[in-house]
């Protein structure tokens, strides 16, 4: 593809390389380093004048450092006269801080949106935003892609009893997500209502729906410490489910997450590779990964060529 340059940040170079390979491109030359006072330095190693630039950087790992690196890369390309700069952020940072849910709470997702715009981003590509209203925090185009087509494909190919499954949301907020998947599989859905007093602490769960003698598939956009989904798995098994799977777009898996998954009765915990999972897979055999590089690559190709991206909302590109 002419007049396009693809750069990778430090957060997820494996995913960036997969995207580049699918597009038939070489990753652009960029050198990032830290000064002795921990300031981030970025040097773009090739001309971007008049080019359509895409920078892939996920909101994971050292999130604050990686966010700052992304902002500097965007700005460096912008002031080097690139025609357009698109930030490809598979897992959007600070997405859970999307509303003022208590006195004096910041809306940090809006702040991140402002920072990306001020840095010079012309367009954002992301996946399964924790709160879809974050798109409205921007005054530039935002394409929020969905892992759902890839999830449906994985279910059909890997769960032999998928016609006897029930799709379960671990909280009321995910009801729209699970009903969409259930409708497309032509199966039923259920949800778990949770009462939470503190972040990452689940106090009480109420199952709404009948899971008896069915394969239960928990679906959510992300899991952090995994307290919710592990409690949900116990709830589903006690309610008569024959097997329990969890499918998540963003597997953050911090703190006690891995030990909780190992102790829980999951057949598998399936995540996409919006966040690197290689190290976690070494400590947990239940984790399986869906590659979404083809979705990002096709979104980049369509954006560059001025084509519609909405096809990707319902199809997995080859």
Curated annotation (Swiss-Prot):
The keyword Endoplasmic reticulum does not apply. Mg(2+) binds at residues 128, 130, 139, 143. PROSITE patterns: PRPP_SYNTHASE. ATP binds at residues 96-101, 130. Gene3D superfamilies: 3.40.50.2020. It catalyses: D-ribose 5-phosphate + ATP = 5-phospho-alpha-D-ribose 1-diphosphate + AMP + H(+). Pathway: Metabolic intermediate biosynthesis; 5-phospho-alpha-D-ribose 1-diphosphate biosynthesis; 5-phospho-alpha-D-ribose 1-diphosphate from D-ribose 5-phosphate (route I): step 1/1. Pfam families: Pribosyl_synth, Pribosyltran_N. Residues 212-227 are annotated as: Binding of phosphoribosylpyrophosphate. Its cofactor is Mg(2+). GO terms for molecular function: ATP binding; kinase activity; magnesium ion binding; protein homodimerization activity; ribose phosphate diphosphokinase activity. One of its GO terms (biological process) is pentose-phosphate shunt. Its EC number is 2.7.6.1. One of its GO terms (cellular component) is cytosol. The keyword ATP-binding applies. Activated by magnesium and inorganic phosphate. Competitively or non-competitively inhibited by ADP, 2,3-bisphosphoglyceride or GDP. Keywords: ATP-binding, Kinase, Magnesium, Metal-binding, Nucleotide biosynthesis, Nucleotide-binding, Transferase. Homodimer. The active form is probably a hexamer composed of 3 homodimers. Belongs to the ribose-phosphate pyrophosphokinase family. PANTHER family: RIBOSE-PHOSPHATE DIPHOSPHOKINASE FAMILY MEMBER, RIBOSE-PHOSPHATE PYROPHOSPHOKINASE 2. HAMAP family: RibP_PPkinase_B (MF_00583_B). Catalyzes the synthesis of phosphoribosylpyrophosphate (PRPP) that is essential for nucleotide synthesis. This is Ribose-phosphate pyrophosphokinase 2.
């Amino acid at each position: 593809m002419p007049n396009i340059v693809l750069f990778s940040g430090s957060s997820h170079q494996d995913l960036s390389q997969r995207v580049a390979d699918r597009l038939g491109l070489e990753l652009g030359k960029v050198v990032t380093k830290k000064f002795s006072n921990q300031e981030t330095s970025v040097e773009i190693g090739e001309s971007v004048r008049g080019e359509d630039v895409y920078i892939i950087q996920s909101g994971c790992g050292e999130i604050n450092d990686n966010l700052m690196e992304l902002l500097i890369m965007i700005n460096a390309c912008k002031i080097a006269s690139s025609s357009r700069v698109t930030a490809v952020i598979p897992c959007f940072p600070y997405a859970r801080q999307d509303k003022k849910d208590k006195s004096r709470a910041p809306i940090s997702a809006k702040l991140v949106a402002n920072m990306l715009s001020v840095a010079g981003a012309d367009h954002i590509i992301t996946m399964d935003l924790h709160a879809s209203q974050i798109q409205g925090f921007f005054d530039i185009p935002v394409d929020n892609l969905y892992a759902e087509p890839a999830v449906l494909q994985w279910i059909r190919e890997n769960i032999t009893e998928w016609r006897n499954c029930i799709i379960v949301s671990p909280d009321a907020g995910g009801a729209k997500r699970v009903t969409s998947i259930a409708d497309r599989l032509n199966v039923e859905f259920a949800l778990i209502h949770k009462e939470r007093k503190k972040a990452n602490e689940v106090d009480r769960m109420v199952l709404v729906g009948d899971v008896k003698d069915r394969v239960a598939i928990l679906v959510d956009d992300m899991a952090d410490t995994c307290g919710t989904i592990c409690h949900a798995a116990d709830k589903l098994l006690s309610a008569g489910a024959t097997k329990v799977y969890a499918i998540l777009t963003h597997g953050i898996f911090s703190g006690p997450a891995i030990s909780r998954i190992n102790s829980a009765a999951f057949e598998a915990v399936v995540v996409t590779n919006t966040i690197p999972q290689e190290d976690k897979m070494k400590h947990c055999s239940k984790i399986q990964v869906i590659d979404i590089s083809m979705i990002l690559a096709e979104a980049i190709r369509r954006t560059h060529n001025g084509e519609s991206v909405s096809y990707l909302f319902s199809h997995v590109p080859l």
